[in-house]
From Swiss-Prot:
Residues of the active site: C456 (cysteine persulfide intermediate)
Residue ranges the record marks as coiled coil: none
Enzyme Commission numbers on file: 2.8.1.4
Stored CDD domains: PPase_ThiI (cd01712), RHOD (cd00158), THUMP_ThiI (cd11716)
Binding site for ATP: L183, I184, K265, G287, Q296
Similarity comment text for this entry: Belongs to the ThiI family.
Gene Ontology process terms (BP): thiamine biosynthetic process; thiamine diphosphate biosynthetic process; thiazole biosynthetic process; tRNA 4-thiouridine biosynthesis
Main subcellular location: cytoplasm
NCBIfam families attached to this UniProt entry: ThiI_C_thiazole (TIGR04271), tRNA uracil 4-sulfurtransferase ThiI (TIGR00342)
Metabolic or biological pathway: Cofactor biosynthesis; thiamine diphosphate biosynthesis
Gene, per the UniProt record: thiI
A GO molecular-function descriptor: tRNA binding
Protein name stated in the entry: tRNA sulfurtransferase
PROSITE patterns: RHODANESE_3, THUMP
Length: 482
């Protein structure tokens, strides 16, 4: 198993010292994740690219997933590496790999070469292409728009025959940009905006203003943990939860209805600024898009920005909702967002779209700011890696089962994509697939005389979902951990 990792082109327009630092950080990020997820896989920095090698293909899929989900990588070449004697030896190796691929098709040969050789790249392309054309009668050469492009690289004394080219995430390596604090609600927008800053190289910490109780917090923890685990697990980041119920109660009691939405957002930013200052974080990230709701007009956004010195970043400011949902689907947060309640939208019945500074200040003068300060003071700060541990601690009453009886039903709560990749098949045991985001609404329709065991890959989601079902009064739920 061998992969050649090509950093994003923007890395190479930096000065030599910055470029070297960025690639070292990318190397470190990859090594920390790959060593955790695999055994015997090496990560080697080759200055202008990174090589990832393993003695066997045992960890091929896991390694490829890490490489295509790590920020800072433009593309990944999956290669077969060997030595060579001369151009004819290279041709014979290319023929062995590509004979069936080019049969009955048009093709061309493209070569990248580094090092000192007695041939040029063009000479090598012509030699190999001519040889393939003569050896495979049904194939024909077409230099423009061929059906197949035979690609390989010659690096000094090594030949890299390209098996496949995999698109990377792009962006900058995680940790090359300053940290940001994402105001995450679990919906489409905040998840996508968090992802975009991870992709751009920032360590994203998560700040959650809890307006919906334990169930809402568990849901937001799930999506935050998912984003970190899939795209940013080389970084140590925080998940911070602030109970905003007292703040909302104060607003509902003392603030005019039309100003409530903007004032609530101003309270979010004030609290976010306090938390960011405490942890030395320069920027707040939100999922706001221009005109999407009443508080997101230019006038209102300006009034919201004015309450904090922290830089407010809005990567989705000009995005259409449809495009946001499409990206959420692509990165895997759509299923979380579909079932995440939106509590902010119900706070104001007749929201203003063009708030006036004097009116806002008049209404906020009625507000007891010690309530906000106390809420921030009582904020719960945790390492996002502890969410998995906490799910075990929060649900001690959820029984873990490793052996199955014939009278139980196993509920596979993974996403359809995960279930398709690794179907769960158990001899003599009924297995039903209900994605986690449908479990809350579908579970009540099941035969409640039966016992149900929830299953997911790592056991995090299954424990959290079991806790929610038990809190809702269901006692016939356990977690299956084979």
């Amino acid at each position: 198993m061998k992969f050649i990792v090509k950093p994003h082109p923007e890395v190479f327009v930096k000065s030599d010292s910055v470029r070297k630092r960025f690639i070292r950080i990318l190397e470190s990020n990859l090594r920390s994740i790959i060593q955790r997820e695999t055994k015997g896989v090496e990560v080697i920095n080759r200055r202008d690219h990174i090589e990832v090698t393993g003695l066997s293909d045992e960890y091929r899929d896991v390694t490829l997933a890490v490489l295509t989900q790590t920020p800072g990588i433009h593309h990944v070449l999956e290669v077969k590496q060997s030595g060579f004697k001369d151009m004819h030896d290279i041709f014979e190796q290319c023929l062995e790999m590509n004979r069936e691929v080019i049969e009955g098709k048009t093709f061309c040969v493209r070569v990248k070469r580094r090092g000192n050789h007695d041939f040029t790249s063009i000479e090598l392309e012509r030699y190999v292409g001519g040889g393939l054309n003569q050896s495979v009668e049904s194939a024909s050469v077409r230099l423009k728009n061929p059906e197949v492009t035979v690609k390989f690289e010659v690096a000094n004394d090594k030949l890299n025959l390209i098996i496949a080219r995999h698109k990377g995430l792009g962006g900058f390596p995680l940790g090359t940009q300053e940290d940001v604090l994402s105001l995450i609600s679990g919906g489409f927008d905040s998840g996508v905006s968090s992802y975009l800053h991870i992709k751009r190289g920032s360590k994203v910490h998560y700040l959650f203003f809890n307006l919906g109780g334990p169930a809402h917090e568990i849901g937001v923890k799930q999506v935050s943990h998912f984003l970190w685990k899939k795209y940013g697990s080389s970084a140590k980041v925080k998940f911070i939860s602030v109970d905003f119920d007292p703040v909302v109660a104060e607003i509902l009691e003392k603030v005019d209805d039309g100003q409530m939405g903007v004032i609530l957002k101003r309270m979010f930013m004030r609290a976010g600024g306090m938390v960011a200052e405490k942890f030395g974080i320069e920027g707040l990230v939100t999922g706001e898009a221009l005109g999407q709701v009443s508080s997101q007009t230019l006038t209102n956004l300006r009034h919201i920005d004015n309450v904090t010195d922290s830089l407010i970043l809005r990567p989705l400011i000009n995005w259409d909702k449809e495009d946001i949902i499409d990206l959420a689907r692509e990165i895997g947060t759509e299923d979380f967002a579909k079932t995440m309640p939106e509590y902010c939208g119900v706070i104001s019945k007749k929201p203003t779209v063009k708030a006036v500074k004097e009116k806002l200040e008049k209404e906020e003068a009625k507000f007891d700011f010690s309530v906000l300060e106390q809420a921030v003071y009582n904020a719960r700060v945790m390492d996002i890696r502890d969410i998995e541990k906490e799910s075990q601690e929060q649900a001690p009453e959820v029984e873990m089962v490793s052996e199955l009886g014939s009278d139980v039903v196993v509920l596979d709560i993974r996403s359809a994509e995960e279930e398709d990749e690794k179907p769960l098949e158990l001899d003599g045991v009924e297995v039903t697939h209900i994605p986690f985001f449908k479990l809350a609404t579908k579970f009540g329709d099941l035969d409640q005389s039966k016992e149900y065991l929830l299953y997911c890959e790592r056991g995090v989601m299954s424990r959290l979902q079991a806790l929610l079902l038990i809190e809702n009064g269901y006692k016939n739920v356990k977690v299956y951990r084979p």
